[in-house]
Amino acid sequence: MNVFINAEVYNDLISYSLRRLPEEACGFILGGQDSGNGELQTSTFIPLRNIASNPWNRFEISPVEMLPYLMDSNHPVIGLFHSHPTAPPLPSEQDLQTLWHSIPTYWILSLQQPQRPELQLYQIKKAPQTAYHKLAFVIGQ
Protein backbone atom coordinates (compact mmCIF):
# COMPACT_ATOMS: atom_id res chain seq x y z
CA MET A 1 0.00 0.00 0.00
CA ASN A 2 1.32 3.42 -0.99
CA VAL A 3 0.16 6.72 0.49
CA PHE A 4 0.13 10.10 -1.24
CA ILE A 5 0.32 12.93 1.32
CA ASN A 6 -0.55 16.37 0.03
CA ALA A 7 1.81 19.11 1.20
CA GLU A 8 -0.86 20.97 3.16
CA VAL A 9 -1.66 17.89 5.28
CA TYR A 10 2.05 17.27 5.88
CA ASN A 11 2.71 20.89 6.89
CA ASP A 12 -0.39 21.00 9.11
CA LEU A 13 0.56 17.95 11.13
CA ILE A 14 4.12 19.19 11.63
CA SER A 15 3.08 22.69 12.72
CA TYR A 16 0.39 21.31 15.06
CA SER A 17 2.85 18.85 16.60
CA LEU A 18 5.45 21.56 17.17
CA ARG A 19 2.84 23.76 18.88
CA ARG A 20 1.87 20.88 21.19
CA LEU A 21 5.43 20.24 22.42
CA PRO A 22 6.40 18.90 24.92
CA GLU A 23 3.18 16.84 24.74
CA GLU A 24 2.29 14.24 22.14
CA ALA A 25 0.02 15.58 19.44
CA CYS A 26 -2.65 13.38 17.88
CA GLY A 27 -5.30 13.45 15.21
CA PHE A 28 -6.94 11.80 12.24
CA ILE A 29 -5.98 11.84 8.58
CA LEU A 30 -8.95 11.94 6.22
CA GLY A 31 -8.84 10.86 2.61
CA GLY A 32 -9.69 8.03 0.28
CA GLN A 33 -8.39 5.38 -2.04
CA ASP A 34 -7.59 6.01 -5.69
CA SER A 35 -9.71 3.55 -7.65
CA GLY A 36 -7.13 3.42 -10.43
CA ASN A 37 -4.01 2.43 -8.52
CA GLY A 38 -5.29 1.64 -5.03
CA GLU A 39 -3.08 4.34 -3.50
CA LEU A 40 -4.39 6.07 -0.38
CA GLN A 41 -4.64 9.83 -0.83
CA THR A 42 -4.88 12.32 2.01
CA SER A 43 -7.27 15.25 2.02
CA THR A 44 -7.29 16.71 5.54
CA PHE A 45 -5.49 16.57 8.87
CA ILE A 46 -7.88 16.78 11.84
CA PRO A 47 -6.06 17.73 15.07
CA LEU A 48 -7.63 16.13 18.14
CA ARG A 49 -7.07 16.92 21.79
CA ASN A 50 -4.78 14.59 23.73
CA ILE A 51 -6.64 13.80 26.96
CA ALA A 52 -4.10 11.30 28.36
CA SER A 53 -3.23 11.72 32.02
CA ASN A 54 0.44 11.73 30.98
CA PRO A 55 0.41 13.44 27.55
CA TRP A 56 4.21 13.74 27.44
CA ASN A 57 4.64 10.09 26.49
CA ARG A 58 1.25 8.78 25.45
CA PHE A 59 -1.91 9.89 23.74
CA GLU A 60 -5.59 9.30 24.21
CA ILE A 61 -8.40 10.80 22.16
CA SER A 62 -11.77 11.71 23.62
CA PRO A 63 -14.47 9.38 22.26
CA VAL A 64 -16.87 12.33 22.09
CA GLU A 65 -14.42 14.30 19.94
CA MET A 66 -13.50 11.46 17.57
CA LEU A 67 -16.90 9.84 17.02
CA PRO A 68 -18.23 12.29 14.40
CA TYR A 69 -15.19 11.63 12.19
CA LEU A 70 -15.43 7.86 12.55
CA MET A 71 -19.13 7.95 11.62
CA ASP A 72 -18.71 10.17 8.53
CA SER A 73 -18.62 7.84 5.51
CA ASN A 74 -18.22 10.80 3.12
CA HIS A 75 -14.80 11.68 4.60
CA PRO A 76 -13.22 8.41 5.74
CA VAL A 77 -10.48 8.26 8.36
CA ILE A 78 -7.51 6.67 6.60
CA GLY A 79 -4.90 7.37 9.27
CA LEU A 80 -4.36 7.72 13.00
CA PHE A 81 -1.59 10.21 13.75
CA HIS A 82 0.47 10.99 16.82
CA SER A 83 3.86 12.48 17.58
CA HIS A 84 6.80 11.22 19.59
CA PRO A 85 8.34 14.36 21.13
CA THR A 86 11.54 12.65 22.30
CA ALA A 87 11.57 9.25 20.57
CA PRO A 88 12.13 7.96 17.04
CA PRO A 89 9.14 7.33 14.75
CA LEU A 90 8.87 3.66 15.67
CA PRO A 91 5.81 2.02 17.22
CA SER A 92 6.24 1.63 20.97
CA GLU A 93 4.85 -1.34 22.89
CA GLN A 94 1.91 0.87 23.78
CA ASP A 95 1.42 1.77 20.11
CA LEU A 96 1.35 -1.92 19.19
CA GLN A 97 -1.38 -2.53 21.77
CA THR A 98 -3.61 -0.08 19.92
CA LEU A 99 -7.20 -0.92 19.22
CA TRP A 100 -6.95 1.24 16.10
CA HIS A 101 -5.68 -1.53 13.83
CA SER A 102 -8.83 -1.27 11.69
CA ILE A 103 -7.73 2.18 10.45
CA PRO A 104 -5.57 1.58 7.34
CA THR A 105 -2.53 3.61 8.39
CA TYR A 106 -0.76 4.54 11.63
CA TRP A 107 1.38 7.71 11.47
CA ILE A 108 4.20 8.61 13.85
CA LEU A 109 6.07 11.91 13.67
CA SER A 110 9.33 12.09 15.61
CA LEU A 111 10.32 15.47 16.99
CA GLN A 112 13.60 14.33 18.55
CA GLN A 113 15.13 17.00 16.34
CA PRO A 114 12.31 19.56 16.01
CA GLN A 115 14.08 21.35 13.17
CA ARG A 116 14.08 18.03 11.21
CA PRO A 117 10.82 16.18 11.93
CA GLU A 118 10.78 12.56 10.77
CA LEU A 119 7.54 10.91 9.66
CA GLN A 120 6.90 7.20 9.27
CA LEU A 121 3.69 5.44 8.30
CA TYR A 122 2.80 1.91 9.32
CA GLN A 123 0.14 -0.70 8.94
CA ILE A 124 -0.56 -2.62 12.14
CA LYS A 125 -2.12 -6.08 12.01
CA LYS A 126 -3.47 -7.80 15.13
CA ALA A 127 -4.10 -11.40 14.07
CA PRO A 128 -2.83 -13.93 14.76
CA GLN A 129 -0.23 -11.81 16.59
CA THR A 130 0.55 -8.11 16.48
CA ALA A 131 2.87 -7.10 13.65
CA TYR A 132 3.61 -3.90 11.80
CA HIS A 133 5.35 -2.84 8.63
CA LYS A 134 6.40 0.47 7.14
CA LEU A 135 4.37 1.95 4.33
CA ALA A 136 5.78 3.84 1.38
CA PHE A 137 4.60 7.42 1.04
CA VAL A 138 5.14 10.43 -1.18
CA ILE A 139 4.68 14.05 -0.16
CA GLY A 140 3.31 16.07 -3.05
CA GLN A 141 1.53 19.28 -3.87
What are these model-derived regions, one by one?
Residues 1-77, 86-141:
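Conserved beta-strand-loop surface patch within small alpha/beta domains used
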Residues 80:
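Conserved, mostly hydrophobic/aromatic
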